[in-house]
């Protein structure tokens, strides 16, 4: 197998390995939409710290990375009464969690995977769609 680009999948062939865009996601690491207990570090300011559920929002194509992008969940959102576009209500039944909460899509964080605790649930597709919309708003995408 020679080196080159496979136009059909956007893959790059290096020797006998296929790398780059279009790879199938590996079977290791958390998946997009999974909820893990995360020990959010104290970075100062008005961001969540300590152990909270967090939704994995990075693409599954980065599952082999040593880092992960998560959005924190909280059951106490002070801005909830104003219903800002970056705050997504998550019902317990939508996530497999013991109580309702809020995804704080204005606070996505890239963290080392060692800060991830056990898997606590998974967002259903409808809840993940709402998180995607809120992330687009918060990040200007």
Question: What is the role of each PLM region?
Answer:
Residues 1-141:
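Conserved functional hotspots at enzyme active or ligand-binding sites that engage polyanionic ligands
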């Amino acid at each position: 197998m020679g080196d080159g680009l496979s136009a059909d999948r956007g893959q790059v062939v290096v020797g006998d390995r296929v790398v780059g865009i279009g790879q199938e996601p590996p079977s290791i690491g958390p998946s997009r939409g999974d909820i893990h207990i995360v020990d959010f570090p104290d970075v100062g300011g008005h961001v969540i710290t300590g152990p909270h559920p967090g939704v994995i929002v990075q693409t599954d194509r980065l599952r082999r990375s040593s880092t992960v992008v998560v959005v924190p969940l909280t059951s106490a959102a002070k801005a909830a009464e104003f219903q800002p576009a970056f705050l997504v209500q998550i019902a317990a039944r939508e996530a497999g969690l013991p109580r309702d909460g809020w995804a704080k899509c204005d606070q996505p964080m890239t963290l080392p995977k060692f800060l991830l605790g056990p898997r606590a649930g998974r967002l259903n597709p409808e809840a993940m769609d709402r998180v995607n919309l809120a992330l687009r708003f918060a990040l200007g995408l």
